[in-house]
Structure formats: structure tokens, C-alpha cells
Amino acid sequence: GGFLLASGGYDRFASVPNKIANTYIVYAMTQAGMGKEIQKEYDAALKIALQSKDGYQLAMMAIAADHMKDKESFQKIMTELDRSYLLSGLVSETSVVNSRGASLRVESHALYALALMLQPEPNILRINELLATILKEKAYYGYGSTQATVLALKAVVSFSKLVGQMAEDANVQFTLNHTPVLDLKTSADHLKEGTNHLVVNYLKPDAMVPYDFDVQYSTHQP
């Protein structure tokens, strides 16, 4: 149920635990479109990931399960990922490039975010939270390791596409001081002195998308 891995070599891959290397290979092969050809390896990696409760392994196998059209396992893994994230912030041992610290956090969180985006009703708030955590790890040279940077960018781009599609499907009404805001822009005519009230109403509660409210003003009173 696993792959025959070379034990020699001087790079970081040689020191990666076999269970993680096998999980990554299954993940990569399902990404490439393979399915029944690696069923035994997939089943073995799935069992090990669920037993490990490791965030990195679980997130990869969630994505693999989706590609394998294994809905039952996908949901089971996502439940475990959600529990792990809420309890411990998604603890992981290491990654396929033997990452630690910030790089490992970015890789694990990016994979978890990508897995969340595969759900029929993605948890947008959770994904936003994960991406915010990832962006905080960004340095001048990227998000840590090359693998971490690639996964971080993939998560950000995928989320942009997801939100864009949801925004097209969402029916949102903005009301400022009981006046509908039709063009999503307001002027002084819509505002009054003192307290102003902005109401955002989603006509489809299952199609909620994030929004930004930008206020610009000048005043003679400091």
C-alpha cells in the first residue's frame, strides 16, 4: 500500500518520514489525474493520515480524496481538520521538504484553505482567517521555503477565483440611512450629522461574500 522510496541521498527529501513522503506522492498523483491506478496506495495513506491527526497530512489527503471522488472520506477528513484547527491550530510534524516553523505553518494552512474551498459551501470566514495567518508570515523573499511560497500563492489565487464566482452569484443590497445604495458608491447627500447606519442584506444567505467599506471624509474640527 506504499511506494518504494530511495533511502540514499543528501538532500532534505532523504530525511522525510516515509508516511509523509507516501502521502505527498498520493496527493501529487491525484492532482495529475490518477485514480484507480493508485487505489491501494491511496487507501493506505488515508488510513495513516487519519490515525496521525497531523494537519499537513490530513489536508493533503482531503484534497486527494476530493480528486478520487471519495466524498465520505473527504468529509471525514474535513471534520478532523476542523477539530484539529480549533483545538491546536493545526499541529503538523513536518512536510515533504522537511519544513519547520513558519514554512510548515504556511504549507499546512495553505493546504487546509485549499481543502476548504473544495466543499460545496466553503467556510469563507475560516478561509479568510487562514489566509490572514499566511500573509503575516510573508517576508521579503517570500513565505519561507519554496514549497511554502508556491502553496501560499496557490491558496491566495484560488480564493480570489472562488470569491469572484461567489460575488457573481450573490445578490447583495446595501442601504445607507434607509436609502438603497444602487451603484455601491455614496456621496454627502446620503450622509447626515451624527450617527449613520449602513445595512448589508444578503438575499441568498448561502452566497455570502466579503465586502470592504471605505470611508473618506474631511472635517474642520480636529
Segments the model singles out, each with a brief description of its role:
Residues 1:
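Extracellular LysM carbohydrate-binding repeats and other cell-envelope/extracellular binding modules
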Residues 5-15, 20-222:
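Long, domain-scale non-catalytic interaction/scaffolding regions in large secretory-pathway
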